[in-house]
Amino acid sequence: MKKLLFLFVSALVGMTVFAQDEMPTVNWPYLYPDFIQGELMQIGGGTSKGQYNIHLGQGALHLVENGQIGEISVQTVMKVTIGEDIFRNVGGRMYKVLAEGKDGYVVGETLADYSAIVRDDGAYGGSLSNAAKGFSYDENYGNYSYLVTNDYADLLSIKNESEELPVTKNTYLVIDNQLYPANKKSVLAIEGVDKKVFSEFLKSNDIKWKEVVDLVKIVDYITSLK
C-alpha cells in the first residue's frame, strides 16, 4: 500500500512539474522540458546513471552524453528511473509506471500526434518542415525518433522556435509482461476471464476505469486467476 501511494504521489509530482513548464514542441519532442538525472537498470542486472528523457515519437529512451543526444536500445533495458518517475520496458517501448500490483502494474503512455501537425486544414501550421529547419515530414516519415539536431545545446536553444506538439495519452494494464488497454473489452479478451464473474467483481468493488487505484485491483484480480 505504501509503495502504491508513493508511485501515485510521484505521478502527481511529475505531472505538476510538466504542467508548469512549456509543452513539447516539434523541435523538442520529449516528455520532460529537459534531460533529467536518472538511473537505468539493465535486464542482466547492471545499472548506470545519466541524463535521460523519453522521446514522444516511439516511447524511446534518449540519453545526453558528451553534449550529444543518443538513443538507447531498450532491448537491454528493464527499467529506468527519471527523477521520481519509473519507466519499464514493455515490448520494446518505455512506459511510465503509474502503480504496481502484486504481479503486474498499470502504465501510462504519452505519444506525439505528428499527423495533427501535417493536416491539410492548416491546423498547427499545416506543415512540419517550417518548424524542423528543412527536415520535411515526408523525408522522415516512419522515423518518429528523429531530431532536428543531435547536439544537446543547439536543440535546447531552439526548442521553443516551433509549434506545440500535440500528444495523445493512453493507459494500459501490464500482466505477464503483456500490454492490455485499460478497458473492459480488452480485459474480457484475456484467457481465463469469465464475463459474468468479472462483471460482478467490477460491481462489488465499485471499479472506475479512470482511477489508477481501481486499475491495480483489476491487475491483481487477473493475476490471481493464473
Which residues are covered by each model-predicted region?
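A short beta-strand micro-motif
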Residues: 37-43
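Glycine-centered tight beta-turn/hairpin loop motif at sheet-sheet or coil-to-beta transitions
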Residues: 43-45, 67
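Aromatic-patch recognition
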Residues: 52-181
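A short, solvent-exposed beta-edge/loop patch
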Residues: 155-210, 214-217
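Bacterial Sec-dependent N-terminal signal peptides
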Residues: 1-23, 218
